[in-house]
Amino acid sequence: MRFCILGAGGLGSVIGGYLAQAGEDVTFIGRPAHMQAIREHGLRISGVRGDHHVTQNMTAVTAPDQAEGEFDYLILLVKGKDTETALAEAEVLQPRVKAMLSLQNGIGKEERLREWIGRDRVIGASTIEGGTLLGPGEAANPITTPITAYFGELDGGITRRIEAITEAFDRAGLGARSVDDIMQVLWEKLVQIGSASGYSASVLGLRLYLQDGWVTRSGAEQFVALVKEMLAIYHALGYEPQNFYAPMSRFKEIDPLGFEEAVEYVMQMGEFLKQQFGDRRGRTSLHEDLVRGRKTEVDTIIKPFVDKAAELGIEVPTVLSTYRIIKTQDEYLDP
């Protein structure tokens, strides 16, 4: 099959690289220095799956009008703030794409894609896979889970095109599953990245990492308060936690616990992670953006909970204060 990655940064390079290594035909659209390095030296990926040097089945270009031929799947992976610019530049691809999906963070992006390319050509997708650009031609893959990607029709159900992309990801070593309700996966993923990112960026400052905060009572209390409020919204939408991205997901365990029990659970989780990973400490990408002085995705990752809570009439003071803290800093950051 032929894939086109629109926004081949860290995650796009990781996913596209593994697909190409498994024999799929992949076209990357990305920044000039990175694309030139891939053309000249191939793509190097390091991380949880070991070290890989991919040299076959890849075409690297810097603009959509340089991409040739038809594509079975167009995967959108630019930052949320860059979506409109990317779509405007990619109009030349519209007649040549059979199906389109977004692996970006957030809720609601699929409706924008339906407006752009047509309702029937957009499918739902979600991944927790981690990807960071280390330099031109080099990407890190620091995070994965046994099932790292989910695909489904946005109106429900599993079709052949859903099965085909699921099988392609599986062949590439990216554990994937087809699901009947992709919207539930998207919302649960948002709870996961929203709680971790909101907590990390609003509580841990410039020096601390996730595990550092979780092992303290005050840090664990703040995290539990945030998770409980986000899960209240998730429940109000008619969903029950499934731990789609286990073992990273712990919502099925935290959800039924009382506040104090949940705090103890999170503190134990923090101690386990400190012992398990030692000096390999973790921050969310939103927190990293804040530390490095770059615009964050706070409006993509946290604001949907603020808006949905207002719509549903649910009080979420921790979510709201978390959003305000990060948004205030975000106003002064560079794009």
Model-derived segments and spans:
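N-terminal glycine-rich dinucleotide-binding loop that anchors FAD/FMN and/or NAD(P) in oxidoreductases
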Residues: 43-60, 193
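NAD(P)+-binding Rossmann beta1-loop-alpha1 motif at the extreme N-terminus of oxidoreductases
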Residues: 1-51
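Rossmann-like NAD(P)(H) cofactor-binding subdomain of soluble oxidoreductases
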Residues: 52-140, 150
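Rossmann-fold dinucleotide-binding core
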Residues: 69, 109-189, 194-195
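Active-site-proximal catalytic alpha-helix in oxidoreductases
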Residues: 183-211, 218-231
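NAD(P)-dependent Rossmann-like dehydrogenase/reductase catalytic/cofactor-binding core
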Residues: 224-335
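Helix-loop-beta segment of a Rossmann-like dinucleotide-binding subdomain
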Residues: 94-97, 138-153, 201-215, 283-292
